[in-house]
Amino acid sequence: MARKKLKKRKLLISLFFLVSIPLALFVLATTLSKPIEISKETEEIDEQQVFIDSLSGHAQILYEKYHVLPSITIAQAILESDWGNSELAAKANNLFGVKGNYKGHHVTMETDEVEKGKRKTIRAKFRKYSTFFESMDDHAQLFVRGTSWNKKKYKPVLEAGNYKEAATALQTSGYATDPDYADKISAIVEKYDLDEYDEVNPSLKSVDLNASIKDSAVQDVWSKPSTDDRSIRLTSAQSYVGKDIKVVSKKQKGQSVWYQFQINDKLIGWIDDSAVEIKEAT
């Protein structure tokens, strides 16, 4: 009788292991096969930093030329274009909501305006640009040239000693109708530490070069030179082999030279110059 009970117990134990081990292995395999989920917030923060990195170098180049604070340029681009995702940015490369025509080109779209404390929607013509950089160039020149009726309209923006003064000057000069515009710009600068770009960077140069990625390139493409803090790897250079690229910015740091490039007027990222074959200047 005791032997029968012992056999029965052994049988139950064997059945337990036969069932539980495969089940455990199945659960483990299922868990390992699932991709690691990245929260939407984390992904969004990365995309935002990539957007900032794509504009910061050119904003510093423009600062040296026109004295518009880079923090203001970037913050306005963020606010006005929703991080480059607005319909106006997509259709017209217009980052700042600048109205009118640009070299005969424009798009007509709806926009919200505040008049006598009331918000209303109107249809207006907005300038259409070839690239984001062209939009930034025109934006800086707008502050320099003023308007047809007041050449010094935006002079206080250019003379501002810091981003808070510049944001206030934007508000008082009538750049935007939103009564909270200055506060919104300052808040963006502070949240993303954009004032760290408010200096002339002599290592940065604007260029215009036709080029291609070398077939043998093993380098990566970055949101800004990988030697810089908080640079984000975007993709491998091999993704762009065989495609014509346009080099639009150059940065030298020690013995390293980096190029910012675009394809079909769209900014891509930064890459070490050893991966690039320059064809000719345009």
Swiss-Prot record:
PROSITE patterns: GW. InterPro entries: Glycosyl_Hydrolase_73 (IPR051056), GW_dom (IPR025987), GW_dom_sf (IPR038200), MGlyc_endo_b_GlcNAc-like_dom (IPR002901). It holds the Pfam family Glucosaminidase. It is found in: Secreted, Cell wall. Keywords: Cell wall, Cell wall biogenesis/degradation, Glycosidase, Hydrolase, Magnesium, Secreted, Signal. Its main location: secreted. Transmembrane segments: none annotated. Induction: Expressed under control of sigma-A RNA polymerase. Its cofactor is Mg(2+). The keyword Signal applies. Residues 203-281 form the GW domain. Its EC number is 3.2.1.-. Inhibited by EDTA. GO terms for cellular component: extracellular region. It is an enzyme of class 3 (hydrolase). Optimal pH is about 5.7. One of its GO terms (molecular function) is amidase activity. One of its GO terms (biological process) is cell wall organization. It comes from the Bacteria. Residues 1-29 form the signal peptide. Is the major glucosaminidase responsible for peptidoglycan structural determination during vegetative growth. Catalyzes the hydrolysis of 1,4-beta-linkages between N-acetyl-D-glucosamine and N-acetylmuramic acid residues in peptidoglycan. Acts processively from the ends of the glycan strands. Also plays a role in motility, chemotaxis and cell division. Belongs to the glycosyl hydrolase 73 family. This is Exo-glucosaminidase LytG. The lineage of its organism: Bacteria, Bacillati, Bacillota, Bacilli, Bacillales.
